[in-house]
Regions:
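Ligand-binding clefts of soluble mixed alpha/beta catalytic domains
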Residues: 1-264
Length: 264
């Protein structure tokens, strides 16, 4: 885990003088490898702090979130600050209606405390540490299709949780991995495979909750039935399929039209 401090932390292979001497480029420390760059663009940093005191507080929260002693919880766990009954109004009946999965997390974890992992990087995929009924867990949720950067983020988080023995909870609501020329150029297949490999190799207990849509390969990457979760819960309006109905109908129509065109 890497904690970076705004306007103070910098990571790069070569500093401004060497970059200027080697390739003639004028660049500042922040432009080459500042905290904001690594928190939002490269994904090198996991947590972005405002100052040194904030960085120490983040480190303390992280140490508290990891199950170092593997001791079962003693005594009652704190209830969520936000009322779980509000979940009925947060998760929409129409799976196509967007919502923020963080609002769901805030209503199921102890004290509504969620230490988000790479919060400013690839916000389509939400990862972080929390406790549920006193048990420390890692949570992965979706805010739409899984981008290539989201695949990298989720794969790293799963591997870290596996190393620390932290059980994983998956909150599925995705149309699958992002498609299109931009996604392909960004390495959708390569990075998506990393995510699927990570969930396949995770030895910790895995639990899956389908909140909305769960389509295509996204179902695999988010620990669908094929990857042996301890159980799968499904929201009453959840949908699981190879692809959405509208997309399937359009594909079949295009295939039929192409077949008719070939036959004259």
């Amino acid at each position: 885990y890497v904690v970076l401090v705004k306007n103070r932390s910098s990571i790069y292979l070569a500093g401004p003088p060497l970059v200027k001497a080697a390739i003639g480029e004028d660049a500042t420390d922040e432009e080459l490898g500042g905290a904001d760059l690594h928190a939002t663009v490269t994904g090198l940093g996991e947590y972005l702090a405002d100052n040194d005191a904030h960085a120490i507080a983040i480190a303390r929260d992280l140490f508290e979130a990891l199950p170092w002693d593997a001791v079962l919880p003693s005594g009652p766990a704190p209830l969520p600050v936000h009322d779980p009954e509000e979940l009925m109004g947060i998760v929409p009946a129409d799976e196509r209606t967007p919502y923020d999965v963080r609002e769901v997390i805030a209503r199921i974890v102890d004290a509504s405390r969620f230490l988000e992992f790479k919060a400013a990087y690839s916000t389509d995929t939400i990862c972080g540490h929390a406790s549920i009924d006193g048990h420390r867990v890692g949570i992965i949720g979706n805010n739409g299709p899984i981008q290539p950067t989201g695949s990298v983020k989720a794969a790293q988080f799963m591997q870290l949780c596996d190393q620390s023995g932290t059980p994983l909870v998956f909150l599925q609501n995705t149309t699958g991995y992002m498609v299109g020329s931009a996604a392909e150029r960004a390495g959708a297949i390569k990075h998506g495979a990393k995510m699927i490999q990570a969930v396949a190799n995770a030895r910790v207990p895995k639990f899956t909750i389908v909140l909305g849509g769960s389509y295509g390969a996204g179902n695999y990457g988010m620990c669908g039935r094929g990857f042996d979760p301890r159980f799968i819960f499904a929201w009453p309006t959840a949908r699981t399929a190879v692809m959405g109905g509208a997309q399937a109908a359009m594909v079949m129509e295009m295939v039929s039209r192409a077949k008719l065109a070939r036959s004259g």
